Amino acid sequence: MLPRAARPPCLRVPGHFAHRGPAVPRSTPRISTRHSIQFRVFSTSKGLLNKNATSEPKTPISGSPLAPQSADQKTKNAQNAAGTPKRDLLSETMVGKQEQRKADWAIMKEMAKYLWPKDDWGTKLRVGTALSLLVGAKILNVNVPFYFKSIVDSMNVDFAAIGGTAYTVAGSMIIAYGVTRIGATLFQELRNAVFASVAQKAIRRVARNVFEHLLRLDLNFHLSRQTGGLTRAIDRGTKGISFLLTSMVFHVVPTALEISLVCGILTYQYGAQFAAITAATMVAYSAFTITTTAWRTKFRKQANAADNRGATVAVDSLINYEAVKYFNNEKFEVARYDKALKAYEDASIKVTTSLAFLNSGQNMIFSSALAGMMYLAANGVASGSLTVGDLVMVNQLVFQLSVPLNFLGSVYRELRQSLLDMETLFNLQKVNVNITEKPNAKPLQLHRGGEIKFENVTFGYHPDRPILKNASFTIPAGQKFAIVGPSGCGKSTILRLLFRYYDVQEGRILVDGQDVRDVTLESLRKAIGVVPQDTPLFNDSIAHNIRYGRIDATDEEVRKAAQRAHIHELIEKLPEGYKTAVGERGMMISGGEKQRLAISRLILKDPELLFFDEATSALDTYTEQALLQNINSVLKDKARTSVFVAHRLRTICDSDQILVLKEGRVAETGSHRELLELDGIYAELWNAQEMSFAQDPESEGNAELEEGAGQEVLPDSRQK
């Protein structure tokens, strides 16, 4: 333990706990003040990099959308800041028939662009070839009944009398029949092969556009998202694209073509009666299918909504697996999931039973028409006006219509389902991006070294609870700046506003004299590096998560960044080293290890403006001090503007300036010594934390060790 005289100057201020007094028994209650002080427990970092580790889950930050305010300007700013309330895109809201029809046509027109894209002659050639093959297949199919008729009529002779065989009598017709059927099948399969790339390319483009749009949406959308339902809706929508494109090209128009050909043949060969029955059958069949399918749509929507809810519950429970276990709530989560499954079960039963009704009605209409036409043909055979071959041909032609008709029925059903699925997908693309660039936005120019200025800034996530209230302060370029205050006073919100996750409702934010709303988002965010409270990690390797700070970084640069973040040696001890996977959201490593990986990212990105939001809260004292030493050396060597948000005041007492927030307003500013001499809120927070160390002998020991380490950590330029 170092003598008190050897401690850093910020820990040796006379009159402010220079004498701590005797240790207070452990049972003595902790001090509590009106400023809602958060006490942090110093603990040893554990996790994947420590064999005796347990993961440390963190609670995600939640937000709520900002409702419109009374004044017009405030309304506009509020909407830009946090978005106006919208209906849940994943809840299949019932709409009127006219609105649904408009939405369906809009989707059809949008998808037509992928079928016949401008300046893409390759796609146009494939679509044209596929259509040609389709027409060829339909023509061959229509010829099959003619060959069948010829075969039957040729065979309707006395073979013994003419001394012939099946081959000599009908051989050529049999061969033509087989070749025609083979040709029709071959054309259909070639059509599918040629069109496959068109459908897959469209799926890829739509899915990429939706994903790109989701990444452009503001933070408010993603804080209120339902991950499981969202991914399920995207999956269903992309699958629906292929079916919709195939239906548009290969089912709807071709079926109409085939029906027209059959009606024309029946009229020409056998008279208007046969064609009239065929046409009436088509009208009745189509009308019944469309009407019944429209009635069934609501059951499909209910099933989709229940499916989304079930996926959301399942993903949410599995992601928060540890929380479920901590509170023994497995039965509760199973009950939640089962409730969603029950809703899906009920809706699916309605879908299935209504489908049975639809199929029965379709078969009844078709079978009635077939029986009527066979009766007319049989009368013709009996009267001698038709041959047995004609009877067979009529039967074949009508049965040949059954295939496209059945397709038409199922296609319409699935087409409606695909349109419903794609409606959600395309609605995601219609979500407004609230945080946008001005048309004349220019790249951020840091010609003053990165001075940050907040001028009369007012902002709140909810109109009834503003976070920042007319806040004004300046963060000088190249200095270490700290922001402290009770929880909920707006410390982390400052970063969100600077990063333009939200826009201010009043006032403005300047970086080197440039309003952040006047510069490009890419240049602004490229200049800012962040170590957040809850470090986001991908379910990938350690190397990938570090390299995410700069995607084009080499392996050597990744290692150097890890070394400066004091995590390289721990990584090297792992069997797979930098290839070790960190698990979903980094759950396989501890909070301290997450923070060091986040700092590695920041070092690799090397931005001009650095934000540390409780960046070392999960580290043990030794690691924290060694890491702060490296961070301070970087700040000193490169003169970076840095902002530290902290509850543990010992980690920021060497800052050039400290800003104290209270209830969204700037309460105090100054150096550590100046604020203690002011004897205001900061002094009260400091004294309360010092008393907490005095009351806990273990914390006292850690504090002494921290102070001793701090003697080496703080650069001379920071000691005041």
Curated annotation (Swiss-Prot):
<keyword id="KW-0999">Mitochondrion inner membrane</keyword>
<feature type="transit peptide" description="Mitochondrion">
    <location>
        <begin position="1"/>
        <end position="49"/>
    </location>
</feature>
<comment type="function">
    <text>Performs an essential function in the generation of cytoplasmic iron-sulfur proteins by mediating the ATP-dependent export of Fe/S cluster precursors synthesized by nfs1 and other mitochondrial proteins. Hydrolyzes ATP. Binds glutathione and may function by transporting a glutathione-conjugated iron-sulfur compound.</text>
</comment>
<keyword id="KW-0472">Membrane</keyword>
<keyword id="KW-1133">Transmembrane helix</keyword>
<dbReference type="GO" id="GO:0005743">
    <property type="term" value="C:mitochondrial inner membrane"/>
</dbReference>
<feature type="transmembrane region" description="Helical">
    <location>
        <begin position="172"/>
        <end position="195"/>
    </location>
</feature>
<feature type="transmembrane region" description="Helical">
    <location>
        <begin position="357"/>
        <end position="375"/>
    </location>
</feature>
<dbReference type="GO" id="GO:0005524">
    <property type="term" value="F:ATP binding"/>
</dbReference>
<dbReference type="Pfam" id="PF00005">
    <property type="entry name" value="ABC_tran"/>
</dbReference>
<feature type="region of interest" description="Disordered">
    <location>
        <begin position="48"/>
        <end position="96"/>
    </location>
</feature>
<feature type="topological domain" description="Mitochondrial matrix">
    <location>
        <begin position="413"/>
        <end position="720"/>
    </location>
</feature>
<keyword id="KW-0067">ATP-binding</keyword>
<keyword id="KW-1278">Translocase</keyword>
<dbReference type="InterPro" id="IPR027417">
    <property type="entry name" value="P-loop_NTPase"/>
</dbReference>
<protein>
    <recommendedName>
        <fullName>Iron-sulfur clusters transporter atm1, mitochondrial</fullName>
        <ecNumber>7.-.-.-</ecNumber>
    </recommendedName>
</protein>
<feature type="topological domain" description="Mitochondrial matrix">
    <location>
        <begin position="50"/>
        <end position="126"/>
    </location>
</feature>
<dbReference type="Pfam" id="PF00664">
    <property type="entry name" value="ABC_membrane"/>
</dbReference>
<keyword id="KW-0812">Transmembrane</keyword>
<dbReference type="GO" id="GO:0006879">
    <property type="term" value="P:intracellular iron ion homeostasis"/>
</dbReference>
<dbReference type="InterPro" id="IPR017871">
    <property type="entry name" value="ABC_transporter-like_CS"/>
</dbReference>
<feature type="topological domain" description="Mitochondrial intermembrane">
    <location>
        <position position="269"/>
    </location>
</feature>
<feature type="compositionally biased region" description="Polar residues">
    <location>
        <begin position="48"/>
        <end position="57"/>
    </location>
</feature>
<feature type="domain" description="ABC transporter">
    <location>
        <begin position="452"/>
        <end position="688"/>
    </location>
</feature>
<keyword id="KW-0547">Nucleotide-binding</keyword>
<feature type="transmembrane region" description="Helical">
    <location>
        <begin position="391"/>
        <end position="412"/>
    </location>
</feature>
<dbReference type="GO" id="GO:0016887">
    <property type="term" value="F:ATP hydrolysis activity"/>
</dbReference>
<feature type="region of interest" description="Disordered">
    <location>
        <begin position="693"/>
        <end position="720"/>
    </location>
</feature>
<feature type="compositionally biased region" description="Acidic residues">
    <location>
        <begin position="697"/>
        <end position="709"/>
    </location>
</feature>
<feature type="topological domain" description="Mitochondrial matrix">
    <location>
        <begin position="196"/>
        <end position="244"/>
    </location>
</feature>
<feature type="transmembrane region" description="Helical">
    <location>
        <begin position="127"/>
        <end position="148"/>
    </location>
</feature>
<feature type="transmembrane region" description="Helical">
    <location>
        <begin position="245"/>
        <end position="268"/>
    </location>
</feature>
<feature type="binding site">
    <location>
        <begin position="359"/>
        <end position="362"/>
    </location>
    <ligand>
        <name>glutathione</name>
    </ligand>
</feature>
<dbReference type="InterPro" id="IPR003439">
    <property type="entry name" value="ABC_transporter-like_ATP-bd"/>
</dbReference>
<dbReference type="InterPro" id="IPR036640">
    <property type="entry name" value="ABC1_TM_sf"/>
</dbReference>
<feature type="topological domain" description="Mitochondrial matrix">
    <location>
        <begin position="291"/>
        <end position="356"/>
    </location>
</feature>
<feature type="topological domain" description="Mitochondrial intermembrane">
    <location>
        <begin position="149"/>
        <end position="171"/>
    </location>
</feature>
<feature type="binding site">
    <location>
        <begin position="296"/>
        <end position="300"/>
    </location>
    <ligand>
        <name>glutathione</name>
    </ligand>
</feature>
<dbReference type="GO" id="GO:0140359">
    <property type="term" value="F:ABC-type transporter activity"/>
</dbReference>
<dbReference type="InterPro" id="IPR039421">
    <property type="entry name" value="Type_1_exporter"/>
</dbReference>
<feature type="binding site">
    <location>
        <position position="461"/>
    </location>
    <ligand>
        <name>ATP</name>
    </ligand>
</feature>
<dbReference type="InterPro" id="IPR003593">
    <property type="entry name" value="AAA+_ATPase"/>
</dbReference>
